[in-house]
UniProtKB/Swiss-Prot annotation:
Organism: Fusarium fujikuroi
Name of the protein this chain belongs to: Polygalacturonase
Cellular localisation: Secreted
Short name of any one Pfam family annotated for the protein: Glyco_hydro_28
EC number, UniProt record: 3.2.1.15
Signal peptide residues on this chain, from the entry's feature table: 1-24
Organism lineage string: Eukaryota, Fungi, Dikarya, Ascomycota, Pezizomycotina
Catalytic activity: (1,4-alpha-D-galacturonosyl)n+m + H2O = (1,4-alpha-D-galacturonosyl)n + (1,4-alpha-D-galacturonosyl)m
């Protein structure tokens, strides 16, 4: 009897450390409370599908150099009604943010959507879901499945040598009206990728389903956007440029991408009455399908509340190439719309373009009053 009791006690004693060590692995996070410890002490972090509480960030801004973070399961976010709140923040050097098979990052957009996006003062909501700031050193964000973000999805700022690839951004749940939006789509201002004040950023092979710009570069240099699939939004955009702390765009390539069921295909927009520079931008091998407003749109009369119809020339737009932009727009749309300020556009090149279907006559005031065919 005594021997059996001692034997059982010994087996339990020796079993405890192994189980305890598994439960206490600081690098495998199963609830929000373990996140800070993992970020400070680990270089290979696994986030195992937990809810981020109200008012708390999924803070990955202090990752060690060369860290890898892998999302598993379903990561969700409790409601935080605050325009200045960023649910996810990422920063680091030579870091990798990725997702395991079957994972989902759900931004809880349904709790916020009201058809107004960032234009509502009474119904506050996080303006950017994921902020990638000062991320450098050949860092990578890959293979993430993100859905239902409240307003803008990615804000990429102050970063360099960064590649984002293989992402699926899916906000189609916001296409239909809800009780707050009346007849409007519930989701609004839901840009996929906003890029500012960054250098050598590459977006490749990403799918975006949303209700605003698929990609919007408002400032930055040496940006490459390739093999994108953009559906439901406002297309591949430069701008709006002007009136911000950084108003220089120089060296952007949009390559081999599809824009479908969207308001615009290729768009360059500068803010009315503002100053800045847009230089050396190429749209090449862009396929358009069922564009509802403009196949190609260059306008210098932009305001968030709507264009003024009177272009200004404070933002200089130069060395712009449209090469093999092809496809169809809706019968209610215009194939081309170019509205430049007095003397502020120069060096546009058009080659191999074929945009058809627009029932409204194209309108261009540069380089001549005749639009490209």
């Amino acid at each position: 009897m005594v021997r059996n009791i001692v034997s059982r006690l010994c087996s339990q004693l020796f079993a405890l450390p192994s189980s305890s060590l598994q439960e206490r692995d600081p690098c495998s996070v199963t609830e929000y409370s373990g996140l800070a410890t993992a970020v400070s002490s680990c270089k290979n972090i696994v986030l195992n599908g937990f809810q981020v509480p109200t008012g708390k960030q999924l803070d990955l801004s202090s990752l060690q150099n060369d860290s890898t973070v892998t999302f598993k399961g379903t990561t969700t976010f409790a409601t935080t009604a605050d325009n200045d709140f960023n649910p996810i923040v990422i920063s680091g050097s030579n870091i990798t943010i990725t997702g395991a098979s079957g994972h989902v990052i759900d931004g809880n957009g349904q709790a916020y959507w009201d058809g107004k996006g960032s234009n509502s003062n009474s119904n506050q909501k996080p303006d950017h879901f994921i902020v990638v700031q000062k991320t450098t050193g050949n860092s990578k964000i890959t293979n993430l499945n993100i859905q239902n973000w409240p307003v803008h999805c990615f804000d990429i700022t102050g970063s360099s040598q960064l590649t984002i690839s293989g992402l699926i951004l899916d906000n189609r749940a916001g296409d239909k009206p809800n009780a707050k939006s009346g007849s409007l789509p519930a989701a609004h201002n839901t840009d996929g990728f906003d890029i500012s004040s960054s250098d050598h950023v590459t977006l490749d092979n990403n799918h975006v389903y949303n209700q605003d710009d698929c990609v919007a570069v408002t400032s930055g240099t040496n940006i490459v956007v390739s093999n994108m699939y953009c559906s439901g939004g406002h297309g591949l955009s430069i701008g709006s440029v002007g009136g911000k702390s950084d108003n220089v765009v120089d060296g952007v390539q949009f390559l081999s991408s599809q824009v479908v069921n969207s308001q615009n295909g290729c768009r360059i927009k500068s803010n009315s009455g503002a100053t800045g520079t847009i230089n050396n931008v190429t749209y090449q091998n862009i396929a358009l399908t069922n564009i509802s407003t403009y196949g190609v749109d260059v306008q210098q009369d932009y305001l968030n509340g709507g264009p003024t119809g009177k272009p200004t020339n404070g933002v200089k737009i130069s060395n712009i190439k449209f090469i093999k932009v092809t496809g169809t727009v809706a019968s209610s749309a215009q194939d081309w719309f170019i509205l430049c300020g007095d003397g502020s556009c120069s060096g546009f090149t058009f080659s191999g373009n074929a945009i058809t279907g627009g029932g409204k006559t194209s309108s261009c005031n540069y380089p001549t009053n005749t639009c490209p065919s």
